[in-house]
Regions:
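Flexible, glycine-rich terminal cap/loop adjacent to redox cofactors
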Residues: 162-167, 171-197, 209, 213-219, ...
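Local sequence-structure signature of Cys/Sec-based thiol-disulfide redox active-site neighborhoods
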Residues: 8-73
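FAD-site-proximal beta/loop scaffold in flavoenzymes
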Residues: 323-339, 428-503, 594, 598
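Glycine-rich dinucleotide-binding loop and its adjacent helix/turn
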Residues: 140-148, 208, 308-364, 368, ...
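Short hydrophobic core segments
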Residues: 159-162, 281, 289, 300-311, ...
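Non-catalytic, surface beta->alpha helical segment in thiol-disulfide oxidoreductase systems
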Residues: 106-136
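Glycine-rich flavin
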Residues: 149-157, 174-339, 369-375, 380-381, ...
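Extreme N-terminal leader/targeting segments of oxidoreductases
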Residues: 128-159, 177-178
Length: 644
């Protein structure tokens, strides 16, 4: 791999496999050695300082650079060199306790210098150059070496983040908090239906936030229709009149709230001294980014590091007339008309969530699915969700088919044609067709080839290791990489990345045991492995499943929600070979997200079944059911829970 430095005072032969070395100058009065990992900001600054000094004193100073690929390899070198340090600098030298990049020492005589700030002080003292006649004073050295770096910076920015979603914003603000000069680029290309939005990415504008608010509206509608009378509420003396749902009012209110969030994000960036540019970013080379805007034109900026956080967009429907379909980019922003009778195409969580809240608001809804529901989730839980949506919510599923064509009728409705699983040609008219067949990473416009960034050919997403791409100064986070497509994951990985780049942290993102919730009419929360994955990974004989059905107390007065077909369900997947260590947790019922957050912490702490059931529950809450799980699947025992 890398070459070793043959004439260094320290013996480096035993770790040469970890080292990349670049010889700068030789045979001069004093030679300085700089060891560090190549994207470390302090190491880069130290190299800029010595470059300036070399220009001042080309005949008196020499520099050798020991360049490591990453922080871990640098630390391995430090540890392996402790014996050499003790011999060269003394067992009580500060070198023995120095653990950060850069590590600087000099020869003639052998002297440990320290880090970046120590190096600058060393030059200011004049020791390094000896100050012979005609040489600059220490103050002049300090002034020249500092201005040589500051007046002509190598890059416009320390970090450019391409993408203004929550992951990109978290990364940029964290980097700025460590004194880095940061720029965020964010421009939303309108959807095929013309929908665009402000700062904050998918989650804030067309994802988590509007979805959760509209889901809540749907739940309120269900309570009004099915539960309110049972709980003593009447809307007139005869109990017949119910409120009328107003889609346009709901969308306007949600829109107003989202715009306040967009504005707050801009204010927050400004307060953190992060430059915000409403431009589309693409690569010219690994350190140069082109900014484009259809009205503002183009320009270029340079940067030391880049984080790609552009997220993903809905996949387009490819059948004839697919352009008539709206996507999740559009459904929350339909201000001019309500959805009406809707066909949802897809079996993803987006498809089922949208179908659920539209039905809850009183619209007729059908869902067309090609294969199984919620492919990446536990399939028993997915089937239970499908059963609930069909039996309890009244949503019809058109299974094992895809649309053959969509055409617009004279009355503005959309005529959808398909072939059912029996081979019969079918057609039906809808007011809205919602395409939710998946999402693709938004990478086509980035010019990744110009920066040497490689994609996973199977998924189309950027290949990374610890968020670092195939180009060392370019990183990627969020939906654009092969990781859980969840906003908190993007936020956490972005924040931790900045801490590693600019605050000497070594904490990596842990993508295991990440909680998530699907906001279908009956909510589903999960963390860890599915039953299928657990059996495949550890063997069916080593897996024990504890499970139960239950009816939440708040559902007990309503005959509609008390029926057995919609009873809630909990499943805990355990490894019998490891003290019933919990591998996966699955919850189907109200407030699933609130229940799952605590379980996520428990799973990160590697809790066991015994610890769970020995915890005192809160009565009478649905989460209390976790503490009284007794029935195993292998026993075949009944799982119907009793009431309070």
């Amino acid at each position: 791999m890398a070459n070793n430095i043959s004439n260094t005072t320290l013996s480096l032969t035993k770790i040469s496999c970890l080292l990349e070395a670049q010889e700068v100058v030789s045979d001069t009065l004093a030679t300085f050695y700089l060891a560090g990992w190549k994207t470390c900001p302090s190491f880069i600054k130290a190299r800029e300082i010595v470059a300036a000094m070399q220009m001042l004193y080309p005949d008196r100073l020499a520099f050798k650079i020991l360049l490591f690929e990453d922080r871990e390899k640098f630390r391995v070198w430090l540890k392996a060199s402790q014996g050499d340090f003790a011999v060269s600098f003394g067992a009580k030298s500060k070198a023995m306790k120095h653990v950060t990049s850069p590590f600087v020492w000099s020869s003639n005589p052998t002297t440990f210098v320290g880090g970046c700030d120590d190096l600058l002080l060393f030059f200011r003292s004049g020791i390094a150059v000896g100050r012979p006649q005609g040489m600059h004073t220490s103050d002049e050295v300090a002034e020249i070496s500092s201005t040589a770096v500051q007046e002509k910076p190598i890059f416009d920015y320390d970090l450019v983040v391409i993408g203004g979603g929550l992951g990109g914003l978290a990364c940029s603000k964290e980097a700025a908090s460590f004194g880095q000069k940061v720029c965020v680029l964010d421009y939303v290309k309108p959807s095929p239906q013309g929908t665009a939005w402000g700062l904050g990415g998918t989650c804030v504008n067309v994802g988590c936030i509007p979805k959760k608010l509209i889901h809540q509206s749907s739940l309120i509608g269900e309570i009004i229709r099915h539960d309110s009378a049972r709980f003593g509420w009447k809307f007139d003396n005869e109990g017949k009149t119910v409120p009328v749902f107003d889609w346009k009012q709901l969308v306007a209110n949600v829109d107003g709230y989202i715009k306040t969030i967009n504005f707050k994000y801009k204010v927050k960036l400004r307060s953190k001294n992060v430059k915000y540019e409403n431009f589309l970013g693409s690569f010219v080379d690994p350190h140069t980014v082109k900014l484009s805007h259809p009205r503002k034109g183009t320009k270029q900026i340079t940067t030391r590091n880049v984080v790609i956080a552009v997220g993903s967009r809905p996949r387009e429907l490819t059948c004839p007339g697919g352009e008539y379909a709206v996507s999740s980019d559009d459904i929350f922003w339909m201000k001019e008309k309500e959805p009406g009778k809707t066909l949802v195409i897809g079996a993803s969580y987006v498809a089922l969530e949208c179908a659920g809240f539209l039905k809850g608001m009183g619209y007729e809804v059908k869902v067309m699915v090609r294969s199984i529901l919620l492919r990446s989730f536990d399939q028993e839980m997915a089937d239970k969700i499908g059963e609930y949506m069909e039996v309890q919510s009244g949503i019809k599923f058109i299974r094992k088919t895809v649309p053959q064509s969509i055409s617009r009728l004279e009355n503005r409705q959309l005529l959808v044609k398909w072939v059912d699983e029996k081979g019969k040609t079918c057609e039906e008219a809808f007011n809205t067709v919602l395409n939710a067949t998946g999402r693709d990473p938004e990478v086509a416009h980035l010019g990744l080839d110009k920066a040497g960034v490689k994609l996973n050919e199977k998924t189309g997403r950027i290949m990374v290791k610890n968020e670092q791409t195939s180009t060392s100064n370019i990183y990627a986070i969020g939906d654009v990489v092969d990781a859980p497509e969840l906003t908190p994951v993007a936020i956490q990985s972005g924040r931790l990345l900045s801490q590693r780049l600019y605050n000497n942290s070594s904490v990596q993102m842990d993508y295991d045991k990440v909680c998530t919730t699907v906001f279908t009419p009956i909510e589903y929360g999960c963390c860890g492995l599915s039953e299928e994955t657990s059996k495949g990974r550890y063997g069916e004989d080593n897996i024990e499943i504890y499970h139960t059905n239950f009816v939440p107390l708040e559902w007990s007065l309503s005959s509609e929600t008390r029926t057995a077909s919609n009873s809630c369900y909990i499943k805990v997947v355990c490894d019998k070979s490891r003290d019933k260590f919990v591998l996966g947790f699955h919850y189907l019922g109200p407030n699933a997200g609130e229940v799952m957050q605590a379980m996520g912490l428990a799973m990160r702490l590697r809790f066991t079944y015994d610890q769970m059931v020995n915890t005192v529950g809160i009565h009478p809450m649905t989460a209390e059911s976790l503490t009284i799980l007794e029935v195993t699947k292998s026993s075949g025992g009944a799982t119907t829970g009793g009431g309070c």
